[in-house]
Amino acid sequence: MSIMSYNGGAVMAMKGKQCVAIAADRRFGVQAQMVTTDFQKIFPMGDRLYIGLAGLATDVQTVSQRLKFRLNLYELKEGRQIKPKTFMSMVSNLLYERRFGPYYIEPVIAGLDPKTFEPFICSLDLIGCPMVTEDFVVSGTCSEQMYGMCESLWEPDMEPEDLFETISQAMLNAVDRDAVSGMGVVVQVIEKDKITTRTLKARMD
């Protein structure tokens, strides 16, 4: 069994029209054994910037804390909010530093540029190689199912409510086909003037 699927989990991000959405499941388990159903996998890294971490649960918490530390140092030094692309480089550097004994996580970043409010999404592998796309990114144990759902449902330039519906349906249907993820979904829709957080009920078996 791969260490990446030891705890299970699924994270996804999508672009819309002047908005982005990021979603993650809530399950934390050890292989087939369930531990909790409210595990945090999406972390705020700015006013309109979020990171979702799928992979080994211990590394999820370690990396989120180390990123917060580096982010605070950056904002103190620069005196401004970090741009999503710069934050992607920060995450990439953190992961690549540990390439010979990596953090077993695959991050997904979603946010809006603090000045232009341009939507940005990307995913990285466990040694920090980034992939920036214009539609959607996925990470976790049911990535094949998530890709299938996203390719079926995603459309360009969706309004925030349509984007929420699309990412919710894609996520709920993908995690239903994976034994080690699910137990509810948290969705954040990031817009220019507000962030909407919704918790969705899912199958609990």
UniProtKB/Swiss-Prot annotation:
Database matches in InterPro entries: Ntn_hydrolases_N (IPR029055), Proteasome_beta_3 (IPR033811), Proteasome_bsu_CS (IPR016050), Proteasome_sua/b (IPR001353), Proteasome_suB-type (IPR023333)
Cellular component aspect of the GO annotation = cytoplasm; nucleus; proteasome core complex; proteasome core complex, beta-subunit complex
- Top-level taxon of origin: Eukaryota
Alphabetically list the UniProt keywords.
Cytoplasm, Nucleus, Proteasome
Question: Record's PROSITE patterns?
Answer: PROTEASOME_BETA_1, PROTEASOME_BETA_2
Localization in the cell: Cytoplasm; Nucleus
Biological process terms in GO annotation: proteasome-mediated ubiquitin-dependent protein catabolic process
Query: Does the keyword RNA-binding belong to this entry?
Result: no
| Function in brief | Non-catalytic component of the proteasome, a multicatalytic proteinase complex which is characterized by its ability to cleave peptides with Arg, Phe, Tyr, Leu, and Glu adjacent to the leaving group at neutral or slightly basic pH. The proteasome has an ATP-dependent proteolytic activity.
- Recorded family membership: Belongs to the peptidase T1B family.
What does the subunit comment say?
The 26S proteasome consists of a 20S proteasome core and two 19S regulatory subunits. The 20S proteasome core is composed of 28 subunits that are arranged in four stacked rings, resulting in a barrel-shaped structure. The two end rings are each formed by seven alpha subunits, and the two central rings are each formed by seven beta subunits. The catalytic chamber with the active sites is on the inside of the barrel.
Name-wise, this protein is: Proteasome subunit beta type-3
Which species is listed as the source? Answer: Oncorhynchus mykiss (Rainbow trout)
